[in-house]
Structure formats: structure tokens, C-alpha cells
């Protein structure tokens, strides 16, 4: 079995409304829950009662389309509302991700780490230290999990931010995006995925279900082709 680690905040965990998109039903897509692999159902990353559709579902579905005989397992460790500081290597979210990944790796081969985080750091100039903090997280993950060329796929923040609802104060989202892209360009096996053109729920901060499906396809494209996705894909 192959496996994928999901880390970040609520748009990685997923807040898309489940009734807005067709169900992904595939016995070859598993998720880690209570220490056991079980068939994927959404929400995959149940961190809140409002958890819903995540980009990881369509990422895994795309992977299965091109790997006909294998299984893929999702390791959900994202936490809604978490800042980059909440993912510091001495704190519980990072430690939990390491524990869950090591447990999953006992009977799976980790092939990718999916990261989406930054809404909680898109104000008050927090982008200025984002690059260095992200580097510490990723380098420590690599060392702790003995990862050499496993890709880190990092998603950008939506251009709907800074306008309404809970996203109103996220006025520096574009500056965070620039740091994410700069990090991907500076490091091997790190690929940036744009959120350009994606849409939010009425709350103004969380990607809706259709956009989560599209985002997962973009993440997979970056993973498969080992390159940044800086514009929306055709026919996604």
C-alpha cells in the first residue's frame, strides 16, 4: 500500500459540503482511523463537527486511476484554525503527525506529504517569517521519517480571501502565497499548487466542495509531473 500524509489547517482537513459533490467510493482508497486502515469515506479528516470534503479525496481518486492494482491510504492530521506556529516541531500537532505517519509506514510506503496552511498567518505581517518556519517543519519531517525524495505538495491560498466573512481579515494571503511559491522554487521535491479561480463557502474562508475536488486534481498533477501548478488546469 502507498500512503499520503495530510497536514495543515481547515482547508486541508476539508470543509466542503458533502451533499454538493458526488461521493468518491473506491475500495482501493483507505484512510487511517483509530489505528486501522478502513475504506475512505468523507469527511476523511474529522477534526471538527463541520468537517467535510477535502482535496485528499480527489487526489487519491486520481492516483487510483493511474495505479490500477494498488491501494492508497490517507493519513489525516490537519487541524482547523492552526497557525504555522501551532505546527512548530515541539508542539502536539507536529508530534502527532510524526506518530501517525510512522504508524502508517509500518505497512505502507509514504509517497507524498500534502500541506495546506496559511489563512491563519495572512495578517499582521506573519508572512515575513513564514518561509523559515515552514523550512524547519519540512526539514524535521524529512529527518524524522527518513524521507529523501518524497515530494511535499504545498497549496496556495484562495484569491477570494480578504473580502467577506471569516476570510475578511486575511488581507495578506497573496504575500503568503509568494512565500510558498518561493519555498517551492528554492527546494527540490517541493511543488506549489495555485488556488487561483477556486471558490469559497458562504463563510468566505473555506473552499467549497467543488473547489476542493478541483484542488485535489491540481495537487495530483503537481505530484505526478513533479512541477508547480501556477495556473488552473484545463478541463479540471
Where are these regions (language model features)?
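Cell-envelope and extracellular/periplasmic
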Residues: 1-236
